[in-house]
Every structure is written in C-alpha cells, then in structure tokens.
From Swiss-Prot:
It is found in: Nucleus. GO terms for molecular function: miRNA binding; zinc ion binding. One of its GO terms (biological process) is negative regulation of miRNA processing. This is Zinc finger CCCH domain-containing protein 10. The lineage of its organism: Eukaryota, Metazoa, Chordata, Craniata, Vertebrata. A zinc finger (C3H1-type) spans 36-63, 73-99, 134-161. PANTHER family: MUSCLEBLIND-LIKE PROTEIN (PTHR12675), ZINC FINGER CCCH DOMAIN-CONTAINING PROTEIN 10 (PTHR12675:SF6). InterPro entries: Znf_CCCH. Specific regulator of miRNA biogenesis. Binds, via the C3H1-type zinc finger domains, to the binding motif 5'-GCAGCGC-3' on microRNA pri-MIR143 and negatively regulates the processing to mature microRNA. The modification Omega-N-methylarginine is found at R186, R187. Its main location: nucleus. Pfam families: zf-CCCH, zf-CCCH_2.
Length: 435
C-alpha cells in the first residue's frame, strides 16, 4: 500500500488507496528476479496482477513471510492538498479529510463513519463492505472491475457490485472460495454519503456542467478515486469562476460597443440613402422640364402665328373696306322691278360694271384664306348676319328693300370714330379667336 512518507525516501509507490496499482518501478530500487534479497516487495504481486514472473525486479514474498497482509493493503492515503485548501483535482484519488481524521486513522486504523461512507461511495460499495481494520482481508479490486482471472485462488475478497458477496474468509488464501454465504449487504443510500449539513452544500448553487478533467488510464488504478463527483467548491474553483465571469463581462462590453458602432453606421447609411433619393428626384424633374418646354413652344408659336395671320387678314379687310367709293343716288333709290336709268353724264357702257363690294376679286382670296385658316384651327359654330335696313339722311326718303343686300353699313358713335364693315348677302362663318 502506498505511503506518503515513503515518497520522500524514493521507495513509495505511485498507486493510491487500497491495492494501489503502481508498477514495480514505484516499489523502490533493487535488481534480480523473484528471489531478490532487496526489501522492496512487488506490490503487483501482492495484488496477484504481476505478469512479469521471474523477470520482475522486486521480491515476490511467500504468504508465510507476510505476517500481516492487510497492513499493506488496507491503508488509505489522505489528500494533503485538500487539507491545505488547494486541491483542484475533480477526481482526486485520495481521501479528503481533515488532519485530525488522518491522525485518528493512523492511531486506530479505522476511518471515521463519515469518511467510510465517502470511500464506499467512490468504490461503489456499501460502508459495511469496507474492512473495519488493517487486519482484515482486503477487497479484490480487479473483481470489482471484472478483470480478476484468479477465481477461487484469489487471496482477496470478492464482493459483487450489487452487494451480493461471499462470506468473509479468514486467513489469506481462501477469501474468494470460502464456503457458506452471508446475507446480502444492503444497498447504500446515495443521499447519506454527501453529508450535506457538515459540508455546507446547501449554501452553494449548483455549478455549471464542465468537461471532465484528465481521467485515469484504462489500465490504471482508476478505482481508487474515492470522490469522483463529490469534490466541494473550494477556493481554486471559485477563483476560476471569478476569472471566467470577468472575461465574460469584458466580452459583453465589447459586444455592446460593436452594437453601438453598427447603429451609428446604420444611421449614416440611412442619411446617405435619403440624399441619393432626393438627388435622383431632382435630376428627373430637371430632365423632364426641357422636354415640356420644347413641346409647348411649337404650340405657342403656332397659336401666335395663327393669331397674327387672323389679325393681318382682318386688317387688310378693314383697310379695303374703309376705302371711299362713290355711291350714286340711283343705286340707292332704284326700285327692284324697274331698271335704273343711266345717268346723263355716265360713260358709255363699254366695260362691264364693277362687281359689288362683296364680290371684289381682291377681297375674295383673302376671305377664302381666312375661312380656311379658321376651319383648320377649330370647328366654330356658324354665325349669320342678317341684312339691316339703313336710311341715309341727306338723301330724300327712299324705300330700301329688306331683301336686297346693301353694299356697306355705316355705323356712327358719339365717342368713337366711324368704321365701315362690309356685309355680304350670303352667310359667312366667323369664329371668335381668343386673344
């Protein structure tokens, strides 16, 4: 069984707990075969797992030479790091107990009831299955793992994992093959092993799940880890949690800064997007305005030209109509039924009489052009002017026929100059144009 005092002398074993599974190199110096004179005893041989035989460097004692086999097999090792409040191993192989518990174990060879429950829980056994002292035959650890090939020849007690075990045999040879059977041991209560009031687990919140640390190798003595999942929350773990919380807080602050930067960038991009949209609208309006002006310009020009043509034609007609023409009294007084007598001073009828004013060849083309221009511009409503009866003051009372058209109409106004307009006997389409 490994002892911490032997580590300082270089003769201790690396295995911890009952049946430490260290190799023969940990047993101390010495050469030779199984009959070597060195005091270093092969601990694998004590566990009946040494496969080196005569090639083993350490001594393989006979059972008669080992006066007290339990002294080497039933010794438990206490964790000194736990006593110094610095044990950070999640699966510590040693017993976590106080210095007083260790001193009491060294004096009496028995563990306190509280520690017995923890050790039994780490081995998957009931506290009643643990040896009560160093004089008892130790438990076969290989059988607990299902690797014991010795059967009835095994020197250690074979206990079932479901706590149906054989009777405890005396001596060192018939532990596994003794006759008779004892009643099966009771199943241990999982809630009894935690010792909550004494350990103070009620004051702590359950810790987060973490990846399990370095486990023991499959061929190593992993059965000696007494407190696999019962490691208390100590100072080292508290410091690790505080450091992790500090790192997480820094990470949160960095993420908040990134979020604020992204929000500011988003606002700038939104402003630029709005500016680009306004510029696109201004460019569209400016490109549409010249086209509208070009479309309206010919229309205005056409209307202006049209109005100018109408005004010019009207001016020509007015100027021609205002030209004085001698009108004889016979033309005004002549009856409709009798032909007018030729005047005495009239010229011989060598040439045909001039046409009436409404049939003047100079005015006719202008009137036709005016009518064509008005008809092309828009469809006006027809306006007819009826002949008007006019009487001439200086002439004697003459009956003027209402049916006969007159050559001209003289209109007078007190405030405006006299203007003469020609009147035709036929209907004339006149359209009022907007000025």
């Amino acid at each position: 069984m490994p002892d911490r005092d032997s580590y300082a002398n270089g003769t201790g074993s690396s295995g911890g707990g009952p049946g430490g599974g260290g190799s023969e190199e940990a047993s101390g110096a010495g050469t030779g075969s199984g009959g070597a004179t060195s005091d270093a005893i092969c601990r694998d041989f004590l566990r009946n797992v040494c496969k080196r035989g005569k090639r083993c460097r350490y001594r393989h004692p006979d059972m008669s030479e080992v006066s007290n086999l339990g002294v080497s097999k039933n010794e438990f090792i206490f964790c000194h790091d736990f006593q110094n409040k610095e044990c950070s191993r999640p699966n510590c192989r040693f017993i976590h107990g106080s210095k007083e518990d260790e001193d009491g174990y060294k004096k009496t060879g028995e563990l306190p009831p509280r520690l017995r429950q923890k050790v039994a829980a780490g081995l998957g056994l009931s506290p009643a299955d643990l040896p009560n002292g160093k004089e008892e035959v130790p438990i076969c650890r290989d059988f607990l793992k299902g690797d014991c090939q010795r059967g009835a020849k095994c020197k250690f007690r074979h206990l079932q994992r479901d706590f149906e075990f054989d009777a405890r045999g005396g001596g060192g040879t018939g532990g596994g093959g003794s006759t008779g059977s004892a009643p099966p041991g009771r199943r241990h209560d999982l809630y009894d092993i935690y010792d909550l009031p004494e350990r103070g687990f009620e004051d702590h919140e359950p810790g987060p799940k973490r990846r399990r640390g370095g486990c023991c190798p499959p061929d190593g003595p992993h059965f000696e880890s007494y407190e696999c999942n019962l490691a208390p929350l100590r100072g080292v773990e508290c410091r690790l949690l505080e450091e992790e919380n500090a790192l997480l807080r820094k990470r949160v602050e960095e993420l908040k800064k990134q979020v604020s930067n992204l929000l500011a960038t988003n606002e700038v991009l939104l402003e630029q997007n709005a500016q680009f949209r306004n510029q696109a609208k201004v460019m569209t309006l400016s490109s549409t305005a010249p086209a509208t002006e070009q479309t309206l310009a010919p229309t205005v020009g056409t209307v202006a030209t049209f109005n100018h043509g109408i005004a010019q034609t009207h001016t020509t007609l007015s100027s021609q109509a205002l030209q004085p023409r001698p009108v004889s009294q016979q033309e005004l007084v002549a009856p409709t039924g009798a032909p007018a007598a030729p005047p005495t001073n009239a010229a011989p009828p060598a040439a045909p009489p001039p046409p009436p004013p409404h049939l003047n060849p100079e005015i006719t083309p202008l009137s036709a052009a005016l009518a064509q221009t008005i008809a092309q511009g828009m469809a006006p409503p027809p306006v007819s002017m009826a002949p008007v009866a006019v009487s001439v003051a200086p002439v004697a009372p003459v009956a003027v026929s209402m049916a006969q058209p007159l050559a001209g109409i003289t209109m007078s106004h007190t405030t405006t100059p006299m203007v003469t307009y020609p009147i035709a006997s036929q209907s004339m389409r006149i359209t009022a144009m907007p000025h």
